[in-house]
Amino acid sequence: MAAESGSDFQQRRRRRRDPEEPEKTELSERELAVAVAVSQENDEENEERWVGPLPVEATLAKKRKVLEFERVYLDNLPSASMYERSYMHRDVITHVVCTKTDFIITASHDGHVKFWKKIEEGIEFVKHFRSHLGVIESIAVSSEGALFCSVGDDKAMKVFDVVNFDMINMLKLGYFPGQCEWIYCPGDAISSVAASEKSTGKIFIYDGRGDNQPLHIFDKLHTSPLTQIRLNPVYKAVVSSDKSGMIEYWTGPPHEYKFPKNVNWEYKTDTDLYEFAKCKAYPTSVCFSPDGKKIATIGSDRKVRIFRFVTGKLMRVFDESLSMFTELQQMRQQLPDMEFGRRMAVERELEKVDAVRLINIVFDETGHFVLYGTMLGIKVINVETNRCVRILGKQENIRVMQLALFQGIAKKHRAATTIEMKASENPVLQNIQADPTIVCTSFKKNRFYMFTKREPEDTKSADSDRDVFNEKPSKEEVMAATQAEGPKRVSDSAIIHTSMGDIHTKLFPVECPKTVENFCVHSRNGYYNGHTFHRIIKGFMIQTGDPTGTGMGGESIWGGEFEDEFHSTLRHDRPYTLSMANAGSNTNGSQFFITVVPTPWLDNKHTVFGRVTKGMEVVQRISNVKVNPKTDKPYEDVSIINITVK
């Protein structure tokens, strides 16, 4: 076989490989037409086979709204879950306001007004006025914080200079007033103030520094009694609302009381301001954002509505009705069932006595957040992202009503802080920090409460008590207490003699005098003799004090029930604690229990009035007896023989 040349070998290899490669030929026009027809037939068949709605192209998921710098804004709001401090009036506090001049003003049901000054940390008392002889109906502070006024059912208006905390004028109105509001802006010639007649829709405009003669009367603007009058200082316009759900815009003396020209509507039908009338509700609180562009309202139907001021269009609606809270509790438990039931009872009482009208709403300094009180506590709502970002005071035993918000630094230093001062490393200047504070009133309480960024101190010293007793008891209260209480009605120790041994206890008559008095008098009278420990839960507590032995009986020495006496130094933080059994807030009778473990979840729900000092093993033995698993009642009775009060 002849040898092949290199080129011949390469050609032969190429020829052998060529058949294996596919031919790259183009489809003819006829073949292309056939292929398209087949493809169309397949598509038609697929369409015929498809039953139901056609699949749509997947839509892009909506991007969640985010408020830029939200964390910074929230840092300038109170964040503590419990109130730091509380102060007293003689009677139930109904109103509270905070001024731009760093004053906090509180008013109580008996016509008294108190001025407090915001300092770097906390507040200090300034002055006390007996402003009205009767009930205070409404209070108002001017937009720049210089003037304050109050109206009461003594048919009078009192005007105060805030900075100098002095009463400067008194107007005799000649009618029962309902609402009041300063309607002047800085620079106006007249310090005009508006007051409404309680039983009609009339609005009277006065010179706050002048006499009793009104400058102007709106007698046809509203046909029903007014519920709110509020000034928007940015747009120099006033918004008023009445019980028929109507909302009106108007101006003060500089614009001759006419309709404002700086809004983008002429007819109310172009707005959403008929929303309240459509829902058969009316605003009980109105406030404006710092830039004046948003109006926040709370309605009598417990819905929070936020409008745009210029257009009158509805922006947000938050449902805070009782039915919504009930559904929320059923979906995801917010509170223990017993506590939820107690708070619902308070809400129904609020509606019964028409106290819902005292609940207000406020904006923060940025206008991005609204704050208002609910049965769960103080809600902080981000109106831009539509989310509840914080709830304050959820574990407190108070129903928050009116709020006043202080933000920033109290203006104690006369010289302004310069850029150089801020950049310096001066430790004195660095200590000057903002102290955001919410000051709030509570339903049927003669105290106002302060929520800050600081949690309350939980020390055992009486000096660190967060509830400040800044009011002395009246002569009548002292007389009643002296007559009712003999010198030996209370004691600081007692021995409970049981069928299983003696339990020595220490009592706290100073911290909870009424509870200890009830226990001591019952004990001396032999009331507890023969009572069984009718409820025993191993690893929890032993309960007694019911003459019926069912857990449903017993009463106090005064007959019926008496109020709770919570004290910050007396907690369920250790075993062998004596505490009152109850069926809810302020329902103490004669039943009490002794814990065998720490039970902190009972704090501010049951009154601690004593501790076991000797005989802990007796308590343990009683807690270990066999009981009916359904009723927690022991199979063999363990009873109190008698109680010796020393």
UniProtKB/Swiss-Prot annotation:
GO molecular function: peptidyl-prolyl cis-trans isomerase activity
Organism: Homo sapiens (Human)
Gene Ontology annotations for the cellular component aspect, listed alphabetically: catalytic step 2 spliceosome; nuclear body; nucleoplasm
Family: Belongs to the cyclophilin-type PPIase family. PPIL1 subfamily.
Protein name: Peptidylprolyl isomerase domain and WD repeat-containing protein 1
Function: PPIase that catalyzes the cis-trans isomerization of proline imidic peptide bonds in oligopeptides and may therefore assist protein folding. May be involved in pre-mRNA splicing.
Ranges for domain PPIase cyclophilin-type: 490-645
WD-type repeats, residues: 80-118, 124-162, 168-208, 213-252, 271-309, 345-386, 401-453
